[in-house]
Amino acid sequence: MYVGYLLDKDNNMYPNPVRHPGLNLNPQNYVPAPPQYSDFPSYHHVPGINSDPHHGQPGGTWSSYTPSREDWHPYGPGPGASSANPTQIAFSPSDYNPVQPPGSGLLPPSINSSVPPLSPSAQRADPYEWMRRTGVPTTTTTTNGKTRTKDKYRVVYTDHQRLELEKEFHYSRYITIRRKAELAAALGLTERQVKIWFQNRRAKERKVNKKKMQQQSQQASTTTPTPPSVGTTAGMGGLCSSSSSNSNLVSPSSMPIKEEYLS
C-alpha cells in the first residue's frame, strides 16, 4: 500500500530490490535486506542477529540466508583479515604433516637398510680370539721357523744350527758379544736367540751334573762295609781271658796218688 508506493516511487533510495520478483508478499512480511560492506567483501549478514527482538522470526515463507556456491572462499582468512592482523599466517592443508611414530621413518632409508637386525645369539657371541681358547693349547708352526705354544713363541732350531751352537758351547760356555754377533749372522738367527740358547744349554748342563752327583753318592753308600760294633769285641776279649785262665789249672790225672789210699 503506502509503503509499497514509496518503494516503487523512489528507486534511488533503495538500489537493491527488497522483494523477490517471484513472490507476492504483503507489507507485514517485509524484512530489510542484509547490508553490504565494501571493506569486508567476505562478510555476510546473518538474519535475525541485529533485528528487533520484538519483531520475532520472519514468516515461514522465508528461509535462512545462505551464500551461493560462487561466493564460497577457500580455506584460510581473507585478504582483509590478513592485513588487519599480520600475526596470523594462512596455510593450506597440504602443508600439514602428521606426527610420524618413532622408529617408522626418522632415519634415512640407506641407514635402516644397511644395519641388519641382530639376533640374541649373535649378540652373545664372543668377538675376540682369546675368549674362544680351549683348555688344551694348540701348537701351530709358521713359515718363519717359530712355533706358537700357548702364550709365547718357541724357536725351532735346525740340525745344522744346533751342531754349530754345541761346538761353540764346548769351546766356551759363555759366549762373547762379538762371537754372538758372528754366530747369529752365520746361522741366520738373531743375537737374542743365540743368547737364549746358551742360557738354556747352561741350565741343562747344571741339571745333568746334579743328577750325576746324586747317582754317585748313592753308589758309594751301598759298596762301603759296616764297621764292627763295640759289644762284639768285648765278648771276644772275655773269651780269650777265660781260656788263658783255664790253661793255668792242673788236671787231676797229673797229681800223684798216695799208696795208703791204694792198699
From Swiss-Prot:
Entry keyword annotation includes Transcription regulation: yes
Segments of the chain annotated as binding DNA: 150-209
Ranges of Polar residues composition bias in the record: 82-97
CDD domains for this protein: homeodomain
Region spans: Disordered: 47-108, 204-263
Residue numbers spanned by region Interaction with 5-mCpG DNA: 192-203
Main location: nucleus
Coiled coil: none
Compartment(s) of residence: Nucleus
DNA-binding in keyword set: yes
Function: Plays a role in transcriptional regulation. Involved in activated KRAS-mediated transcriptional activation of PRKD1. Binds to the PRKD1 promoter. Could play a role in the terminal differentiation of the intestine. Binds preferentially to methylated DNA.
Family to which the UniProt record says this protein belongs: Belongs to the Caudal homeobox family.
Protein name: Homeobox protein CDX-1
Upper taxonomic lineage: Eukaryota, Metazoa, Chordata, Craniata, Vertebrata
